[in-house]
Amino acid sequence: MNKLLVYLFLFVVIDIESHEFNPAHLVIDATTTAEYSYDAKWMYPLKNIGQRAEIIFPEHCSVEAQSPYPQGKYLIEKIILNCDSSLKGHSIEVINLSVLTDALITINFLNDDIFEGLMNLKSSTILIPIQAQNY
């Protein structure tokens, strides 16, 4: 009887599927075309619960976004930012994140500073520090 229960338990456990961790990712690269201009790529998982999350950039930046297109497991949106000053010292917000989707953010500045952060449903705004982070 115990053997039968063990086999039955293993059969049930093998059939369980877990949630695939597929975070959204925002990559922002400073460009040399103009001071405080950035090329960004917003990659949002196609398999998501609810409406697609959107990025709110600082008010001092004008945003030019292309139509999103699917690529692999993500919906890709290319964005051009032209800002009046650096992104450092300002916040970026992601609205409509789902419970199962976190958002990674990577900013590559021209002076080789790199900022990386994580946003989620409870903490959907991130402040980009003025000073570089050292870990």
Outline where the language-model segments fall.
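Extracytoplasmic entry segments of secretory-pathway proteins
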Residues: N2-K3, T32
